[in-house]
Amino acid sequence: MKVISSIQELRDQLRGQNRTAFVPTMGNLHEGHLSLMRLARQHGDPVVASIFVNRLQFGPNEDFDKYPRTLQDDIEKLQKENVYVLFAPTERDMYPEPQEYRVLPPDDLGGILEGEFRPGFFAGVCTVVTKLMSCVQPRVAVFGKKDYQQLMIVRRMCQQLALPVDIIAAETVRDEDGLALSSRNRYLTTDERKEAPELAKTLQRVRDGVLGGERDLGKLEQTARAHLAERGWAPDYISIRRRANLIAPSAAELEAGEPLVVLAAAKLGATRLIDNLEI
């Protein structure tokens, strides 16, 4: 596996490749990330991964400085997955001058849910993903359903900008107790880690309620938020949306069996966790 930080060197290395499968990450790799590499290999060759902690998608009071950076461990994991190239640029490589041009998602998708609580987050994501796509020029790229809204925004962005990249969705990987794998799980204290699976269990109860015939979605959402709050969480949102566009479903759509997803974000102590379940 070649480890490359220069954009020009990356382009030289990949010249002539027309089936490249790309997996962008911020590093601190876990089994969830590695499952993305394996899925990428099913859809293209060679597999290219990137590791870049993107300052543009962090707010002023978020965890950019303390976000875990474990490059040497990550390299060893990617070598075992037979990744062809790891693109690991420095901030100067990616942004040699201030990044004044941004890619802004539409408010109907980028300004809701995560976008409401993390202003500017998706503009940062879209900007860096577009730039990474320009560098790697993949045929396919793999994104996890763990970040459901991000997946949808990136897919729509590629469609609307006519980027010749197919976006592949990967299922969320969970620990044995149901907690969705995340690099931020390492922030949890021992007691918080024991409590953390309650987020997934709460989403399961919401899903069961919908599948059981409950049509008052607001009641399901409020009950779920109250349940987490009683256990010491600080919920940002628990919301049932259409899978197609993350808009709240109408009564007619509910009766017609519209495919849904329930999404959540909540703080446990100082750690903000997100999760979702398709219904």
From Swiss-Prot:
CDD domains: PanC. Keywords: ATP-binding, Cytoplasm, Ligase, Nucleotide-binding, Pantothenate biosynthesis. Pathway: Cofactor biosynthesis; (R)-pantothenate biosynthesis; (R)-pantothenate from (R)-pantoate and beta-alanine: step 1/1. One of its GO terms (cellular component) is cytosol. ATP binds at residues 26-33, 144-147, 173, 181-184. It is found in: Cytoplasm. InterPro entries: Cyt_trans-like, Pantoate_ligase, Pantoate_ligase_C, Rossmann-like_a/b/a_fold. It catalyses: (R)-pantoate + beta-alanine + ATP = (R)-pantothenate + AMP + diphosphate + H(+). Belongs to the pantothenate synthetase family. This is Pantothenate synthetase.
